[in-house]
């Protein structure tokens, strides 16, 4: 069978891990990482400095990996932390208010890991350099930037080309990556180093900003102290795609 056809067929199948949660295969290959400073959407905004850490735009190669189709819910997280008490009505919502350490521990407990920052961006943007999961033009109401968190499968418009839900809005997500400069970046940022973990994706919190379009862009990078908990931040898990069905030896944190 033609290799490209095989890859295409593989993408339509869901993968189950130890927790039987649906995962999607993101194939190996290059994708567009980062943001072009000449991007049309930035030219109409006055606050451009927060996008400097996502430059320069470049082609970046990643090995194949799996990523959860949906964010981890309260119901799933309570299996890991049964002492946590959440209202029944929240069970189908993405868990939030968990620290990076708690998110990381959950993913390892379930036999997975947090996605690296670059993995998250590829799963969200695909290979065609789009700024939002639906394209390059901001569409208000397509993703959740409202007042309330919604179920992980609520918005059919907020689905990437790899069938990953909720990457543009609802809650931001922890990644495994430290906040570091991109390859070939000339930006000097005092926050670079192993102090903050990168979070990705828009959230209901971003509606309070006047530059919602910029903060909602998939290349946008945010960062937070790993020990902190935020009411608009959750997570999903990932797993390396191993050859011949061999189990992943463990995460390689960026």
Where are the regions a protein language model picked out?
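Short, structured beta-strand segments at or near domain termini in extracellular proteins/domains
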Residues: 230-247
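Sec-dependent signal peptide cleavage junction
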Residues: 22, 245-254
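Sec-dependent signal peptide recognition
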Residues: 2-7
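C-terminal motif of bacterial Sec signal peptides marking the signal peptidase cleavage site
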Residues: 15-16
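Functional-site microenvironments in short loops/helix caps that host divalent-cation chemistry
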Residues: 26, 32, 37-38, 86-222, ...
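A short glycine-rich, aromatic-capped structural motif
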Residues: 19-86, 99, 169
């Amino acid at each position: 069978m033609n290799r490209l056809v095989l890859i295409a067929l593989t993408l339509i199948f869901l993968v189950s891990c130890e927790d039987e949660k649906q995962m999607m295969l993101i194939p190996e290959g290059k994708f567009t990482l980062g943001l072009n400073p000449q991007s049309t959407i930035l030219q109409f905004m006055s606050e451009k400095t927060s996008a400097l850490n996502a430059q320069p735009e470049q082609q970046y190669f990643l090995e194949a990996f799996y990523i959860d189709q949906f964010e981890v819910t309260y119901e799933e997280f309570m299996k890991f932390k049964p002492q946590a008490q959440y209202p029944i009505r929240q069970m189908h919502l993405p868990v939030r208010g968990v620290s990076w350490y708690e998110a990381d521990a959950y993913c390892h407990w379930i036999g997975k890991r947090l996605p690296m920052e670059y993995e998250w961006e590829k799963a969200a943007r695909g290979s065609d350099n789009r700024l939002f999961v639906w394209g390059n033009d901001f569409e208000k109401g397509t993703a959740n930037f409202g007042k309330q968190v919604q179920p992980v499968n609520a918005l059919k418009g907020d689905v990437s080309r790899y069938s990953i839900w909720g990457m543009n809005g609802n809650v931001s997500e922890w990644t495994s990556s430290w906040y570091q400069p991109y390859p070939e970046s000339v930006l000097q940022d005092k926050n670079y180093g192993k102090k903050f973990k990168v979070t990705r994706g828009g959230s209901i919190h971003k509606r309070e900003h006047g530059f919602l379009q910029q903060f909602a862009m998939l290349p946008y990078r945010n960062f937070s102290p790993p020990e902190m908990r935020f009411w608009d931040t959750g997570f999903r898990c990932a797993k390396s795609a191993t050859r011949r069905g061999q189990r992943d030896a463990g995460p390689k944190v960026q």
